[in-house]
Amino acid sequence: MEKRTNYPQLTEKQNHFFKLIVDTYIKTGASVASKELVKRCNLKCSSATIRNVMASLEQIGFLEKYHISSGRVPSTLGLEYYAKFLVYNPKKYFDQKLEDLLAKRRIKIDATLEEAAAIVSEVAGVTVVATSNNAAETMKSIQLTTLSELSAIVVIVTSSGRVESKIFNFENSDISLEDLRVAIRLFKERLVDTPLIHLANKARALTPIFGQQLKNYELILQKFIKNIFVFEEETTNKTFNKGAIVLSRNISREEIANVLDLIEKHSVWESIDNDLDEDNNIKLDVSRPNLSIISKKIDFSNEKNIKEITVIGPNNLDYGESFEALEMLEKIIKEKK
């Protein structure tokens, strides 16, 4: 999807009626006819007036004629414009109190991200994806616990609360328990708060220091580099209410497979080219058949290493509610960082 910077200039009248048309489409999921709009919105104008406005909106590419009825549906371009200029309002959504947003959905102020995402996805009928990346995850502590005269366990606790452990056996080994204690002490002094993915390289840089205090320093360092400090950068997606996509009758099986591959294996944020709001790190994709994707980048450190949160739903999803949900989830992440 190409990043769009210029949109047709709409008059105040066109903006007003276009918003009503898309609002109605979102509520009904069906094409919108002029007579229906007059009746549903209690408009004080004729259906002929609405038809003329619809025709002008169709001419500039904001509406499309539905092939089995006289009504019209918003186009991809129209949905982009609606989301960016008629619904998305940072001041309205971003200035609301977190307590009000949580209370609205009966979520406690101390709710975890998982609890909030699960409830929001269920209530709104959308799929929520929380994407984490361990690039900034650090080692907070490294401990040695003796199991017996012939074995011990090395335990690493990370900044996200993750615990990694590895058993060392000393039988038929040139490494003694005392050597291991010295190594752990040096790692505590030199490697705490080091990103996990940099531990191996940082450990190699300690070779001169280890050489001054240990006889078998090369063997010890190699053991840690190959068996303990084996962390690679990983991006992980946690999905809530995946059934909203899988069970949808409006999305083709092929498109479902494509979206599932996206949310299970890739960064949703990086897959979208269209910035809805660069200042607030929000992207929008309505280019997929019967699908809308709104993704928000998380640019602050947090204990879960969350880097982006995404809402996925049909093209007639409630965009205003989706923006509000993303902002609420971002604030919960901030509360927990």
Curated annotation (Swiss-Prot):
A GO molecular function held by the record: DNA binding
Record's keyword annotation contains Ribosomal protein: no
GO biological process, one term: negative regulation of DNA-templated transcription
InterPro entries (UniProt xref): GAF-like_dom_sf, HrcA, HrcA_C, WH-like_DNA-bd_sf, WH_DNA-bd_sf, WHTH_transcript_rep_HrcA_IDD
Pfam families associated with the record: HrcA
Lineage top rank: taxon: Bacteria
Keywords of this entry: Repressor, Stress response, Transcription, Transcription regulation
Function field: Negative regulator of class I heat shock genes (grpE-dnaK-dnaJ and groELS operons). Prevents heat-shock induction of these operons.
Family statement: Belongs to the HrcA family.
Protein name as annotated: Heat-inducible transcription repressor HrcA
